[in-house]
Amino acid sequence: NNANLVAPFTNNSQYAEDVIDSLYPLEQLYAEGTSMNVSIDVMTDTLKRAGEKTDGSVVVFFISDGEITNEENLKSFKSAAKYVDGGAVLGYGTTEGGNMYMKSSYTGQDELIEDTSSYPRKPAVSVIDEDNLKSIADDMDVKYINMNDASNIDTTINKIKRESASESKDGKVSGYA
């Protein structure tokens, strides 16, 4: 598995939403387990370049279930922290786990993803690992929010907006993505 930058740095919030809507899981034929470690270098480099290109704040939302299934241990995300002005780690899933689905490129319908590491194949299950997610949040000095109880997200976003808003000469606020 590897990490790829799928969109350039932007302050266009509609573009950011469109990119998020276009994300999809790795084709199960090529999947080799999951690990957040593959994202560290790409993320750190992108955050560094973002800080060099703007006078505004660099905000990160790291969205994951936190699960590592490829036998690795979680590495430190501290290398990214010096480039982060705000954000949050958003954790999704439950400790009981849930079946994983992906949209079929043939039918457009959601299909159950299978765990190909066993025979007969079983449904692939996503299980939240809050210890990993909290560790990433601590490393980047941002808040961890379990999205099963998302009551803190509005407060966090409003705080980020207050702390990262920038005004142009004509008084317009910009810089949210």
Where are these regions (language model features)?
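Solvent-exposed coil/turn segments that connect beta secondary-structure elements
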Residues: 2-3, 21, 25, 65-66, ...
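Sec-exported extracytoplasmic/periplasmic mature domains
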Residues: 21, 25, 44-52, 138-141, ...
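Extended, hydrophilic extramembrane loops/domains of integral membrane proteins
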Residues: 130-164
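Membrane-embedded segments
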Residues: 1-48
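VWA/integrin I-like adhesion module and closely mimicked acidic/polar interface patches used
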Residues: 59, 66-132
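C-terminal signal-anchor/stop-transfer transmembrane helix together with its immediate cytosolic
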Residues: 165-177
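Soluble non-cytosolic domains of exported or imported proteins
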Residues: 10, 30-37, 123-131, 147
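A short acidic, often aromatic-flanked loop/helix-cap motif at beta-alpha or helix-coil junctions
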Residues: 34, 96-97, 150-155
